[in-house]
Amino acid sequence: MGAPFVWALGLLMLQMLLFVAGEQGTQDITDASERGLHMQKLGSGSVQAALAELVALPCLFTLQPRPSAARDAPRIKWTKVRTASGQRQDLPILVAKDNVVRVAKSWQGRVSLPSYPRRRANATLLLGPLRASDSGLYRCQVVRGIEDEQDLVPLEVTGVVFHYRSARDRYALTFAEAQEACRLSSAIIAAPRHLQAAFEDGFDNCDAGWLSDRTVRYPITQSRPGCYGDRSSLPGVRSYGRRNPQELYDVYCFARELGGEVFYVGPARRLTLAGARAQCRRQGAALASVGQLHLAWHEGLDQCDPGWLADGSVRYPIQTPRRRCGGPAPGVRTVYRFANRTGFPSPAERFDAYCFRAHHPTSQHGDLETPSSGDEGEILSAEGPPVRELEPTLEEEEVVTPDFQEPLVSSGEEETLILEEKQESQQTLSPTPGDPMLASWPTGEVWLSTVAPSPSDMGAGTAASSHTEVAPTDPMPRRRGRFKGLNGRYFQQQEPEPGLQGGMEASAQPPTSEAAVNQMEPPLAMAVTEMLGSGQSRSPWADLTNEVDMPGAGSAGGKSSPEPWLWPPTMVPPSISGHSRAPVLELEKAEGPSARPATPDLFWSPLEATVSAPSPAPWEAFPVATSPDLPMMAMLRGPKEWMLPHPTPISTEANRVEAHGEATATAPPSPAAETKVYSLPLSLTPTGQGGEAMPTTPESPRADFRETGETSPAQVNKAEHSSSSPWPSVNRNVAVGFVPTETATEPTGLRGIPGSESGVFDTAESPTSGLQATVDEVQDPWPSVYSKGLDASSPSAPLGSPGVFLVPKVTPNLEPWVATDEGPTVNPMDSTVTPAPSDASGIWEPGSQVFEEAESTTLSPQVALDTSIVTPLTTLEQGDKVGVPAMSTLGSSSSQPHPEPEDQVETQGTSGASVPPHQSSPLGKPAVPPGTPTAASVGESASVSSGEPTVPWDPSSTLLPVTLGIEDFELEVLAGSPGVESFWEEVASGEEPALPGTPMNAGAEEVHSDPCENNPCLHGGTCNANGTMYGCSCDQGFAGENCEIDIDDCLCSPCENGGTCIDEVNGFVCLCLPSYGGSFCEKDTEGCDRGWHKFQGHCYRYFAHRRAWEDAEKDCRRRSGHLTSVHSPEEHSFINSFGHENTWIGLNDRIVERDFQWTDNTGLQFENWRENQPDNFFAGGEDCVVMVAHESGRWNDVPCNYNLPYVCKKGTVLCGPPPAVENASLIGARKAKYNVHATVRYQCNEGFAQHHVATIRCRSNGKWDRPQIVCTKPRRSHRMRRHHHHHQHHHQHHHHKSRKERRKHKKHPTEDWEKDEGNFC
């Protein structure tokens, strides 16, 4: 019975609860029906939207029609009641009733009720474009009669706009680089609406930057000189309009959402960049990007400690400005390397770090490995390694093509660059199928990823597997890159003309954290691809990277070592062993549709490699490399113009010498040294190894690699030759130069080359035709000089590295094969040179000569060795053509038979460039100081260094001038001796005519040009020549190699006492506050009254006795001042330092509620309220403002009847010169200004008597007392007697005279100080 009873009782109670709930619900419906107004509160949390977007704040309600309320339409009111920080606000936005919407002035144009006219029950507010200050709490209130409903809608505006500057310099980003910089900063490039929204919130930045629509703009809220733009003195976003994507500016980025947390890491010992990365990883995070730090700052992060970020920059976020935290405005501060606010700190410097931990882990682009060695090159970009994205389609992007003003190559078609690359996917980008396209890699930084193979892994290679790709043409020249060399010098490199870039094509995929990377700029448009049998890959010119894996650390899987070796950019560990073959160079021509690889990779194999370069000039450029034991460096400097010699045969007394485009560089060997010579001819026919061959076309020449033994003339098969343990004992110094050759021999495949004991071989019998290169390996007992950071004692450390010279191609335009309309046309694939009717004018290329008469010429490679090198000297006439001599090194005494007559010497081929008229090449040997050689020296070796030679210098050495032409380059090559010297020989019938202006003399001479002839120093800088080098002494306000940088002199805040600094050309100007003077505002021209303290042009005094606010203001006015106003954080800190009690200030809203005004009628420019203030808490009103002492002087509104101390503020006080008094003068020196309470004394002139007080005082209001002194002449005795007699005689008539007639003395004249009553009290 118990259980059924319990169940019955439970059911009964449930029915009662349901009945009560139903009654309550019916009552609620009835109440709502009776009210007739019901708000539909969504309660879905905050509304979130991004900056500059539109957002709808919902407000829905229902109306029940009632006869009594038929004419009573609902009144809708939107109000913002709280800010994002939680401070109370009551800002009316709009009011709507009877289809009439009235918007508050500050919200006009930004808010609307889109559905209200049609549906009065839908009061949804449409707000936008959003600003960051729009975040907060909004209230929608609907009133009908006595019915009142309201709902609160929180709004959160996400995203922040920030300015980004490259690590290289101000204005150093193209449009593509700007997009990449923003992406690597966890952001996107900002749109104009983003920048406008940021400006409307007070964003002010005088740096022009890219926006997403390819316009360049910058926001200015306060106009100032240098920042007027297109809006003169008006505030607004300045615009340069739509710009060429290759122009250089900064960028404005937009970061939308953080997606994690940014936290500060401040260990006891500060960190280098590498240490900061490791510290973040240990905490399960990564270094934060710039965009992530800005978002964290936007969300409230405040930390006055500089820390590393992922891009190598050092920054810190400031919410509340304070002393020693970077300025008076909130924001993210940046620590720059140089005084002109450019450059990031060196990775070896120590700072704290800011790490980012994602809520949902995702791949972070920001934390990419960059070298942190002290020998690394400068960080060329502010962002890390960029990921090259596929080009968008033609419909989306504007294709910019350079103008062609001259005919193309002689075949009538443009030569195309075939990029041989291993890749996964492709995308086609071609204007029209079938059209040839001049190929080069797009402008931007290129990152090279390298994986060094182990010597043990260098086995037999396989045929290269590659895809053919064509990259679009770069329409504009590039700027110079800077790379740090072994000796601390910075080497500069500049790209060739568009479409003619040569060098290495780099990986477009950013390396992983394990990869060894360094940024290389500019990109070089030559791709090298090879697959090892073990699966490893290696870049043939790994010296372009800073970080290379340890030798021997590779595995069969091709994985790199987790702890790579760090090498300077101009070095590469040796990777060519005795088991290896040279890279195969391949030239191809492509037409029709083409595409850029999505993720191209670079691979290097000592066995085989495929190299693609622009066909017109395969010898244009290849990387610089040096050996650690003897640096052999090529340095490109500019801008300069050089006068170059014509290639022409001249005679010599020594053995016959021919010049060519091939070069080697060796160190002077000891008697025990061995020399190995390798040759890389570029063939036009298929070659292979053993039974293996790689098919090519006649238009795709290949390169073979031949090795020559030192002691045996017998042929050595490549597969049979080996050398033991080259790593610890062989220092390699490799110089590779390319020269085209032509022979008629049919190819038969790879074979050994007969050699001699001298290590010199004849390549005339080579079955190939193409580019010639030599490689020297010297087993050198000399001690090695290692770069900083390498351990020479480590058995795994490489003891040498190949040295590869960089030979830039210089052309005046995009058509390198045509010099002039009358000049000859040269095809590198033909053996015939067809000159035009003109005489010596023409373009000079390696392996080609121009003659007055048209005749066929056969070019063949020859090798000649001699100790004397003859360099032609030419005098250039107007309109002559000049060329770029290919590099050559010096040989030992040996010779090879030549088919040409004795004593005939030909110069090497050159690259053409026009010389401006009225320029000549001065002759003679320059005086070159030790340590700064500018050409290859015979007999001794030297290295480019900052003023100190590394090896002995012989002033008597013959110099080989190697210079460039109109493109404003200087190529400086230092070579050792002895070595191998090989030249190109011209085989032709008849005698070659001498070129105009070319002396047919013998001997070693050189061309010397004054580098200061055209004064490359800008802005009035002084050029100081030092041989073929120069330096600029810059005037004040300028810096840089050529004084091209205008330093902002205002960065160091030279103006004192609150003066405003304005930067001008070669100087600055200080605008001083009132009462200050001098060029730095250092002179205080006006002072304060006694007991008052001066600060930035005003006087302040703290009164400790307590008064009500109104009485305190009256007391300040009696003292010619007011309760203090505050207009800057500095002024606030100064006032807050007076006392330690709550203090009255002059801010109040006694006239209009919430309309706070200063009593001295100055504008409200600065606010420092406590949290949730002002709140008008008391019912009686809180109309006066007090500084709260225990909260750093923050403001609070309180009732005005409190008795508190106060601070008065007034202007500075000084009196001018004292007023002049007739017949009197001042005692002492006369001053222009007198301090308050100063006293001066008058003295009557001689012969005058003084009456009344002779002193006056400077009053506290800046005015003098009114002078009382009167100076008069004394009466004479006879006049007194005559006057007395006259008085007695007329005494009886005295009463008949008027008062005026009876006056004894005339009224004294009016003093000048009485005429100006306004100057006195």
UniProtKB/Swiss-Prot annotation:
Low complexity bias locations: 935-948
Signal peptide interval: 1-22
Modification after translation: O-glycosylated; contains chondroitin sulfate.
Gene3D superfamilies: Complement Module, domain 1, Immunoglobulins, Laminin, Mannose-Binding Protein A, subunit A
The gene coding this protein: NCAN
Biased composition regions of type Basic residues, renumbered to the chain: 1275-1308
Molecular function terms from GO: calcium ion binding; carbohydrate binding; hyaluronic acid binding
Organism: Homo sapiens (Human)
Coiled coil ranges: none
C-type lectin domain segment(s): 1084-1213
Domain Link: residue ranges: 160-255, 259-357
Name of the protein in its database record: Neurocan core protein
Segments for region (Disordered): 362-414, 456-479, 494-513, 532-579, 682-731, 820-844, 876-955, 1275-1321
PANTHER family with a match to the protein in the record: AGGRECAN/VERSICAN PROTEOGLYCAN, NEUROCAN CORE PROTEIN
Cell compartments where the protein resides: Secreted
Function: May modulate neuronal adhesion and neurite growth during development by binding to neural cell adhesion molecules (NG-CAM and N-CAM). Chondroitin sulfate proteoglycan; binds to hyaluronic acid.
Tissue specificity annotation: Detected in cerebrospinal fluid (at protein level). Brain.
Glycan attachment positions: 122, 340, 381, 411, 1026, 1223
Family under the similarity heading: Belongs to the aggrecan/versican proteoglycan family.
Composition skew (Polar residues), residue ranges: 363-373, 722-731, 906-922
Basic and acidic residues biased stretches: 1309-1321
Pfam family, one: Sushi
Domain Sushi: 1213-1273
Keywords, ordered alphabetically: Calcium, Cell adhesion, Disulfide bond, EGF-like domain, Glycoprotein, Hyaluronic acid, Immunoglobulin domain, Lectin, Proteoglycan, Repeat, Secreted, Signal, Sushi
